[in-house]
Amino acid sequence: MEKTVELLEQAGFRVDLGKHVLDRHGYLAGRDEDRISDLNDAFVDSEVRAIIATRGGKGAYRIADALDFAAAHNDPKLVVGFSEITIIQLALWQHANIPSLHGTPSAFYDGLLSETTYRACLTALSSGEPLHLRSMEDVPTSSLTTSGRAEGILVGGNLDMIVTGADWLIPKLNGNILFIEDVKKAGLGHIDRQMTRLLKSGYLENIAGIAVGQFTNFDTTDGWSVVDVLRDRLALIDVPILGGLPLGHGRDALVIPIGTHAVIDADEGTLTVEAAVR
């Protein structure tokens, strides 16, 4: 965390730490009531312009419906994070109509993230210009790319959290572009179950398109990779799909807005997203 604070201060930001940022409660980073207190204190503080998660946010789904959505809407701040922080970001988009930033500059101490990610985060935090991303052949999900063009609000992030919040916290994604990424928590069957649940529940009805990022650390099982599982499930949805995006849990992952207008051009292999900075 010290390195993260140092880098942000070098970039010109003033950094304040939440009262409970170093807490522990079992496998969680503090008690639910303390974590939600830190978040809501930040939402009502007019000097705070962004809230940056220091890690992935285990258990964020326990507190996502307790956010002060009125305060967040009245004085929007960018929540920066990924993994389980996705459910916080989607709740803010749905209930306060504010965008967030998917990605983080804050894990330098364990070597997971790079200078590329850090610079991408600074750009997303400070620039009002659209962000342009290109599908990369060395990201295995690039083979999922189909054809066509789609536009709408880019919504999503970590697949596990999208499924966790579906229906009870986040409504259907009519007319929007779904973005998914994930990292291995269990076997391929877990991804199959997640995608099947979204399909069978009707959650993905009338979506405009799908953007697919990194699915990292998954093993091959009986000749199938995680990309094979995704291809099998996504084949049931007749919308443009753009894979191979450098977004997620992999090294050099970029940072993009969630909850702003986006365009995917599968033929050109590009994703363009309006800035979250207003």
What does each of the following model-derived ranges do?
Residues 2-4, 149-185:
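Conserved beta-alpha junction segments in alpha/beta enzyme cores
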Residues 67-91, 99-106, 237-241:
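Short, acidic/small-residue loops that bind anionic groups at enzyme active sites
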Residues 97-161:
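Conserved anion/nucleotide-ligand pocket segment
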Residues 214-278:
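ATP/nucleoside-binding phosphotransfer catalytic cores, i.e., glycine-rich phosphate-binding loops
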